[in-house]
Each structure stands twice: as structure tokens, then as C-alpha cells.
Amino acid sequence: MGRAARWFKGMFGTKKSKDRSHVSGGDSVKGGDHSGDFNVPRDSVLLGTILTDTEKDQNKNAIAVATATATAADAAVSAAVVRLTSEGRAGDIIITKEERWAAVKIQKVFRGSLARKALRALKGIVKLQALVRGYLVRKRAAAMLQSIQTLIRVQTAMRSKRINRSLNKEYNNMFQPRQSFDKFDEATFDDRRTKIVEKDDRYMRRSSSRSRSRQVHNVVSMSDYEGDFVYKGNDLELCFSDEKWKFATAQNTPRLLHHHSANNRYYVMQSPAKSVGGKALCDYESSVSTPGYMEKTKSFKAKVRSHSAPRQRSERQRLSLDEVMASKSSVSGVSMSHQHPPRHSCSCDPL
């Protein structure tokens, strides 16, 4: 009987304790492996401790029930054996094989029922452990998902910031050249406007100078100076007689004569015979505006000179300072109408 009790204890007690210790050790190892990766909350830890305590209590109860049933079976078997032996001694009763087989069957059924009870208890414990482990695993998975979501949110925020920065840079790069072009256009417009204003000023100056030169030319052509007018380079000599500012006619209109030399070209204005004294004037405007191929030839000049009356000289008279300055200002107004006038000179051609 003692052997049977020890066998039951070894069958249901020690093996169960070893298996449970092995299972709990494996769980602890697994938990240790994952403890660095995930932090289990306090609620799950408390729940795990409570479940382990309940499991331990249930295991103890199952072991106690198994040991009690085993001891009861051993006691019953031992009582039956003692009874049989006592009866055999008393009445010399012989135990047959059938009775032995019947006793073995009874023990087998009893032990089977005890084993089924212990198996049911173990199944309940295993189911409870599976539920606890599933709860813990789900808790860890939820924590992992939350951490991944936070990480993804941070990454998306950083990416959005980078994209916004890149877009702002591209936008600025797109609009900077436009601003520069606008500035360039404004600058060019200002330059053009200043150039146009300068051109207008030059045109006005030229038009005014041309009008002045025309007025001077008309006055010179319609007036008859008393004396000779000689112009060569920057030298100016004016000689007038008493008779001044006569109207031009067919007989007293001055004629233009040309004298060529090696260095200078002379233009001579010659008066007709009716004039009192020799008169000459340098028609600067006509000399500048008239090209060379339109000038009068020597033969034409000779014909004109032959048809004209002989020239009479009069007494020369020096002009006053005011008259000289007025004539000089009129000549300078004529010369301002041209930027680079050629150098001409005029001299009187006495006859």
C-alpha cells in the first residue's frame, strides 16, 4: 500500500510540480527575453500574480485530493487483503485467480477515475494559463501598436515640415527672377525715358538753332551790309559803310564766290554795282547745307560777273563795339546748329 501511495504521489504530485515549474520557468525566460522590448503595465503584473496564486492553490487542492484518494484506495486494498488473509488463515480459504483479477480490475477503474479527475483539473489550469497569457500578449501588442503609431505620427510631421520648406524654397526661387526682371524692366524703362528726354532736348535745341540760322540767313540775304565781312577760322573782321540794311533786289543781291587754297576754303559774298562800297558776307549756313556737286562752276561765275555792273567802293567805316558783339552772337548762333562744322573762311574780293 505504501508503494501505491508513493506511486500516486510521484504520478500526480512531483510530475505536476515539475511540469508547472518548467512551464513557469519557460514563461519567466520568455518574459525576460521580452522585458527589454516592452514594459508591462502594473495592472497586468498584479493580474498575473493573482492568477499564479490561484493556480498554485488549485494545484495544491488537486494534489491533496489525489493523495487523499490514493490513501483511501490503499487503505481499502490493504483492508481487503487483510480480510482475505485472515479468512484464509481461519478457514483455509484459497484465493482463486478470478478473485485476483477482479481486485486488479477494481483498482484499475478506481485509479482511472482518479487520473481523469486530475486530468480535468490540469486542463482547467492550462486553460486559465492560456487566457492569462493571451491577455498579456494582447496588452503587449496594444502597447507596441501605440508606440508605432506615435513614431509614425512624428515621422509624418517631420516629413510634412521638410516638404513645406522645400516648397517654400521652390516658390521663392520661382518668384525671385520675376522680381529681378521687373526691376530690370523698370530700369530699362527709366533709361529709355531719360534717353527720349535727351533726344527731345537735342531735337528742340537743333530746331531752335535751325530756326535762328534761317532767320539770320534771311536777314543776311535781304540786308545789304556796308563794308566787307571776312571770316577765317576764329578771326572776325567787320567793315560796314554808312548805308545799312538795304533790301535785296535782283541787282544788289550778293553772289557767292569760292577761293581755294592749300589749307583753307574761302567763301566770298560779292555785292552788285549799285552798292556804294564793296560788300561781302560768309554764308555759313549755305556752305554747310549745300553739297559740293550743287555749287556753281567757274564758268557760271564768270558769266554772272560779266553781266554785272562794275563795283564801286565807298569809304570804310569801323563799327562800334556793340555792333561787333551783336554780329558775333548771330554768327555763333548759326554755328551752334551743327555739332562738327568744317572750318571755312570768307574774304572780300575787291574789284
UniProtKB/Swiss-Prot annotation:
Composition skew (Basic residues), residue ranges: 299-310
Motif Nuclear localization signal: where in chain: 191-198
Keyword Repeat: yes
Pfam families: DUF4005 (PF13178), IQ (PF00612)
Cellular component, GO annotation: cytoplasm; cytoskeleton; nuclear envelope
Region described as Disordered: 15-37, 299-351
Domain IQ: 99-127, 128-150
Keywords attached to this entry: Calmodulin-binding, Cytoplasm, Cytoskeleton, Nucleus, Repeat
Subcellular location: Nucleus; Nucleus envelope; Cytoplasm, Cytoskeleton
Region (Calmodulin-binding): 98-114
PROSITE patterns: IQ
Keyword Nucleus carried by entry: yes
Residue ranges, compositional bias (Basic and acidic residues): 312-321
Assembly with partners or alone: Binds to multiple calmodulin (CaM) in the presence of Ca(2+) and CaM-like proteins.
Role this protein plays: May be involved in cooperative interactions with calmodulins or calmodulin-like proteins. Recruits calmodulin proteins to microtubules, thus being a potential scaffold in cellular signaling and trafficking. May associate with nucleic acids and regulate gene expression at the transcriptional or post-transcriptional level.
Protein name: Protein IQ-DOMAIN 27
Organism, scientific name: Arabidopsis thaliana (Mouse-ear cress)
